[in-house]
């Protein structure tokens, strides 16, 4: 498939998921993983587990930097605002979760850029902008604020947004009727109705990479 997309000039995004099972599960599974979620936050609490994760990233980054089978965009884990349901590391305060998540993202960015200076990393999130989209979930806008804070204090790097812009009510596809999706930055949800909110967010200088480049 990747050979065909490369021939046709199609840009490909890969989603980095860490299942807690398998031979590598013992090393890669976060020690506070709840045992229920389909994916785990990678374990970066020991040197051995961190090296294992870095080795996996290095293998993927080198392999898929080949122009004939290139992955240009790396989406780091799935809907991380729903860490309790998807990329799990136990029940953690948002600051603790985001500190760990950003380390995973930064590691992927640094390793991928050894092989492809034009590769990009993305934070994956659902439609809950100023509201938790599920029980025990985080608010996306709060998570992005932490991304900015950590990037500013630890050194900025270019990360981007990968939004799953579902309808406000998942069972109702009539997204144009979403009353909880407004054009305000304080909207509860970002859906197909109000994607302009994301453009507003990335256009603010305080949210740009080094204050100048849209994420």
Which positions does each model-derived feature cover?
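Noncatalytic carbohydrate-binding groove/subsite architecture in carbohydrate-active enzymes
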Residues: 96-215
């Amino acid at each position: 498939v990747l050979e065909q997309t490369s021939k046709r000039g199609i840009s490909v995004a890969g989603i980095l998921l860490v299942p807690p099972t398998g031979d590598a599960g013992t090393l890669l599974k976060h020690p506070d993983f709840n045992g229920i979620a389909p994916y785990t936050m990678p374990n970066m609490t020991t040197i051995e587990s961190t090296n294992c994760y870095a080795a996996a990233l290095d293998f993927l980054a080198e392999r898929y930097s080949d122009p004939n089978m290139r992955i240009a965009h790396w989406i780091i884990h799935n809907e991380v605002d729903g860490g309790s349901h998807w990329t799990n590391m136990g029940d953690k305060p948002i600051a603790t979760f985001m500190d760990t998540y950003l380390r995973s993202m930064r590691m992927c960015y640094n390793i991928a850029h050894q092989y492809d200076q034009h590769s990009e990393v993305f934070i994956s999130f659902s439609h809950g902008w100023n509201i938790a989209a599920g029980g025990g979930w985080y608010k996306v806008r709060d998570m992005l604020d932490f991304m900015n804070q950590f990037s500013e204090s630890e050194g900025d790097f270019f990360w981007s947004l990968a939004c799953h812009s579902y309808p406000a009510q998942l069972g109702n596809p009539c997204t144009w009727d979403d009353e909880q999706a407004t054009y305000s930055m304080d909207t509860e949800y970002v859906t197909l109705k109000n994607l302009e909110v994301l453009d507003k967010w990335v256009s603010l200088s305080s949210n740009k990479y080094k204050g100048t480049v849209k994420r």
